[in-house]
Amino acid sequence: MSIQENVESPQYPGDDTRPTSKRELAGWYCYGWAAEVFVVCAMGSFLPITLEQMARDRGVLLSDKTTPCSATWRPPLPPPGSDAPVYLPQVSDGGQCIIYFLGAEINTASFALYTFSLSVLVQAVIIISMSGAADHGTYRKKLLIVFAFIGSIATMLFLVVVPKVYLLGGLLAIISNTCFGASFVLLNSFLPVLVRHHPSLKESEEVASPDDNVTGPRGDPLFSSTGDIDRTNVDDSTPLLGPNREAGKTSAATITSLELRLSTRISSYGIGIGYIGAVILQVISILVVVVVRPPTFSLRLVLFLIGLWWFVFTIPASLWLRTRPGPPLLDSGGKPLHSWTGYMVYAWKSLGKTVTRARQLKDIVIFLAAWFLLSDGIATVSGTAVLFAKTQLNMKPAALGLINVIVMLAGVFGAFSWSYISNFFNLRASQTIIACIILFELIPLYGLLGFIPAVQRVGLGLHQPWEMYPLGALYGLVMGGLSSYCRSFFGQLIPPGYEAAFYALYAITDKGSSIFGPAIVGAITDRYGEIRPAFVFLAVLIFVPLPLMLLVDVDRGKRDAVALGAELDGIPQGSEYGAISDDQTTEDPIEE
C-alpha cells in the first residue's frame, strides 16, 4: 500500500479525510483573531486592573484599616476586636488597600491574583474533563463554540458589575478565563489535523520531479526536488542524507520535516493574526480609558468591548471550521457512547494512562518540564514588570498601556519573522526556541544590573521609565517566537488521534505553572521590601529550561508518539498506518 493511499484511507468510521481548505484555515485564524484579545487586552492589562479597582473602591487603607480608599463610600466598622482607630473622613489616593473577606484581610492587588489562581484550577479540571469528548466523536468544534460564547458573554457582563458586588466580578473573571483556556486547547487540537490533511503535504508524498518544487502556503518552497532538500529549511527531523530517488517516494523523515515546518508556519500566522487584532483593540481600549469617566466605569466598558469583539468574530470561525470528527468512543457493548459522564470518566482514565506511560514519551516529558518552567517565567515576568514599573518607576496607566502596545507590535513581528530568521541562520526548531530563551534571559539580567553602583550612576539597570519600552519590545519579540514554535514543536510529539488530550496537558502545564512564580515573587518582595531582588529568581527560572530543550529529540519523540498511539488504539505494530481491519476497535470499550 502506498503512502498516498495510507493518507487518504479513513482511519475510523466517519473520518473526514478531505484536504484542508483555505476557508477552513481562515476559520482557524479567525478564532485566534477573536479570542487572542482576551488574553492580551483583558488578562494582560484591564481585567486585573478592573478587579483591583473595584476592590479598592470597597477597601480601606492598610495603614489604619479605617480610612476608605475611595471617596464614594463609607466603610463599615472594623471586625470586633480590631484595634483600628476611629473613622476619619479623609481619602488617600496612595497606600496599600485591603478588603475583608470571610473575616480575613486581603490586599486589593492580591484579590486579582487569587481570582486568577482559582480560575487556573477550575480551568485545569474543565480541560481534562472535556478532553475525551474533544478527541472522540463530533464534539471538538461544538465545545469550542460553546466555550467561546460563554466566555465572551461573561466578559461583556462586566459592564453591569459595580464595586458593591465586586465578588461577582471575580466570578465572571473565573468563568471567562476558564472558557478562554478551554477553547484555545480545542483550537490547538485542530492544528495537527489541519497540517495532516494540508494539500502541500499530500503533494509531497508523491514522487517529486527534479524540476518541480512542492510549495507550501503563499508559494514558499517547503522542500526542493527529491534528493535535494532545501538546506535553508533543515530542522530537527530532516535526514542527514536526501531521500532515495530509487525508492519512488518521499521518505517518512522528510514528511515529518515538512509537517514541522508547515505546522510552525500556520501556528506563526495564527499568533501574528491574533496579536494584530489585540493591538487594534488595545489602542481603542486605551482611548476609552483616557476619555471616559469615572475610571471604574471606563475599565468595565473596555471589558465589554473585549467580550463583544470575542463574540462577534467567533461567528465566522464557527461557520468556516469543519467538524473534523475524531474516532467514536465505544461503550462496553461496542456501541457509540453518548453519555457525558462516560466521556468524563474516560477523559480522566485516559489522563491516568497517559501519565503511567510517560516513560514511553521521554521527549514529551522533557519538553513539558521545560515548558512548565518557561511558561511560568513568561507569566511571572509580565506581571512583575508591570508591578515594578508602577510601584518603583512610578509610571502612569497610559504609559503602562503603551508598553503593552509595544509588546504586542513586537509580538506580531516576532510571530511572522522568526521562521525567516531561523531559515536565514539555518536553525533547527529546537535551536530557535533556545535562541528565544537566551534573549528572554536578558530581561532579568538587565534588571540585576541595577544593583551595580557604576550602572546606577549612569541611570541604567531599570532606574528610568524609558528603559521599560525597549525591554517590552524584546519581551514581545521573544513571545512571538516562543508562542508559535513551542506550540507547533509540541504538536509533532503527540500521538496521532490524541491531539486534544495532549494539548490539554500542554495547557495545564502552561496555565498551572503560573500559580507558583507570582507567589514566589510576592514572598521575595515581602521579605526585602522591593521587587528588584526577585529578578534573581526570574533569571534562574528562565535559564533552567535551556538545557532541558537541548535534550529533546524530535525524531525519537515522533517515533515514540506513533508507537504509543498505536498501542492506545489497539493497532498491531506491524499493521499499516491508516488501515482499518474488520475486527479492529477504535478504543478500548468502557462501561457507560
UniProtKB/Swiss-Prot annotation:
The keyword Transmembrane helix applies. The chain crosses the membrane at residues 31-51, 108-128, 143-163, 167-187, 271-291, 301-321, 364-384, 398-418, 433-453, 468-490, 502-524, 534-554. It is found in: Vacuole membrane. Pfam families: ATG22. Glycans are attached at N213. GO terms for cellular component: vacuolar membrane. Residues 572-592 are annotated as: Disordered. Keywords: Amino-acid transport, Autophagy, Glycoprotein, Membrane, Transmembrane, Transmembrane helix, Transport, Vacuole. It is a multi-pass membrane protein. Vacuolar effluxer which mediate the efflux of amino acids resulting from autophagic degradation. The release of autophagic amino acids allows the maintenance of protein synthesis and viability during nitrogen starvation. Belongs to the ATG22 family. This is Autophagy-related protein 22-1. It comes from Penicillium rubens (strain ATCC 28089 / DSM 1075 / NRRL 1951 / Wisconsin 54-1255) (Penicillium chrysogenum).
